[in-house]
C-alpha cells in the first residue's frame, strides 16, 4: 500500500486525497450549514460553517467541528475570519480541519461567517436551536438575562439593519426616498387611469396587460374596439397625469413611506415582539432609562 503499514502516513495520504476532492468541488454551492453563537459576558461571537446538504449540517461531527471552531475563536479573541481560519487545530489549522471534513463527507464546506460584538454585557440567541440563524447583541451596562434574550430574539425575528435612524446611511435613506417617490407617482397615475377607464365603462382588470387584453377578447369579455379605446385612454391619461402631479403631495407621501421604512428597519423603533403596544426603545427605557444597545449582529443561512 501507499502507506506501507505506517498509520500516520496513511492518515496523511487520506487527508491529502480528501483535500484534493475538496478542491474539485470548490465551485459547488454551500447553502446549508451550522451557525452557532457564544457569549463570554462582555463579548459575543457568531461562527457559521457551511455545507451543501441538511443531512451533513445535522451530523453530530459537523456540529461539533463548528462548536470547536467557535470555542477556539472565542478563547483567542479573534477579530477577523482570516484569523479564525489560521488558528492551530489538530495537526494543522482551522481551515485544514474544515478541508479534512469536506474530504470525509464529499461535500463542499466553507467557514463563511464570523461576527463579534463587545459591551459591558452581551446576549446570544440560536433560533429554535436549529443552528440556522443566530443573533448577538451588546449593551452598555448589565441587563436582565430575560430582557437581553428578548432583544436578541427581536433581532432574529424582525431583522433590523440598524440600532436607530443614525445608523442608517444617508445613501440608504436617499434610495428609499427615490423608490417611494417613483412608487407614489406610479400609484397616482394608475388611479387616474383606472378612473378614466371606469368612466368609459371598461373594467380596468380586463386591460391591465397585453396578455389580459388578448385572453379577455378571446373569452368575449371585451371587444377589439374596447381594447383600442383602453390603450388610447391609458396612453393619454398616463401622460397627462404624470405631467401634472402635485409635487408637494408626492414628497409628503414619500416622506411618510420613509418614516414607515425606518420604523421597520431600526431596532429601537420596531414594535416589540413580546409587547406589540410598545417599541423596543420603550421596553428598554421602562426597564432602565440608562440602558442602551451598543451593537448587534445577525447571521442566517437562508435567503430572506
What are the residue ranges of the model-derived segments?
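N-terminal assembly/interaction segments in proteins that build large macromolecular machines
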Residues: 1-304
Amino acid at each position: 500500500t501507499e502507506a506501507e503499514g505506517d498509520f500516520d502516513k496513511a492518515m496523511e495520504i487520506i487527508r491529502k486525497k480528501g483535500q484534493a476532492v475538496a478542491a474539485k468541488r470548490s465551485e459547488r454551492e454551500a447553502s446549508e450549514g451550522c451557525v452557532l453563537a457564544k457569549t463570554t459576558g462582555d463579548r459575543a461571537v457568531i461562527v457559521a460553517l457551511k455545507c451543501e446538504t441538511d443531512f451533513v449540517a445535522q451530523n453530530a461531527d459537523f456540529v461539533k467541528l463548528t462548536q470547536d471552531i467557535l470555542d477556539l475563536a472565542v478563547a483567542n479573541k479573534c477579530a477577523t475570519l482570516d484569523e479564525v481560519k489560521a488558528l492551530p487545530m489538530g495537526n494543522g489549522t482551522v481551515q485544514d480541519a474544515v478541508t479534512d471534513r469536506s474530504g470525509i463527507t464529499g461535500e463542499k464546506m466553507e467557514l463563511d461567517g464570523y461576527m463579534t460584538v463587545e459591551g459591558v454585557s452581551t446576549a446570544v440567541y440560536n433560533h429554535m436551536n436549529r443552528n440556522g440563524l443566530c443573533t448577538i447583541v451588546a449593551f452598555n451596562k448589565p441587563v436582565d438575562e430575560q430582557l437581553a434574550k428578548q432583544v436578541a430574539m427581536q433581532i432574529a425575528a424582525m431583522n433590523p439593519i440598524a440600532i436607530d435612524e443614525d445608523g442608517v446611511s444617508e445613501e440608504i435613506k436617499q434610495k428609499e426616498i427615490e423608490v417611494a417617490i417613483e412608487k407614489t407617482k406610479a400609484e397616482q397615475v394608475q388611479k387616474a387611469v383606472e378612473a378614466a377607464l371606469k368612466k368609459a365603462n371598461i373594467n380596468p382588470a380586463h386591460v391591465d396587460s397585453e396578455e389580459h387584453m388578448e385572453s379577455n377578447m378571446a373569452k368575449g369579455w371585451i371587444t377589439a374596439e374596447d381594447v383600442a379605446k383602453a390603450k388610447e385612454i391609458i396612453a393619454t391619461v398616463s401622460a397627462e397625469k404624470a405631467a401634472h402631479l402635485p409635487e408637494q403631495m408626492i414628497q409628503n407621501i414619500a416622506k411618510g413611506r420613509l418614516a414607515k421604512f425606518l420604523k421597520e428597519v431600526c431596532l429601537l423603533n420596531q414594535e416589540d415582539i413580546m409587547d406589540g403596544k410598545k417599541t423596543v426603545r420603550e421596553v428598554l427605557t421602562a426597564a432602565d432609562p440608562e440602558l442602551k444597545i451598543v451593537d448587534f449582529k445577525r447571521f442566517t443561512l437562508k435567503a430572506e
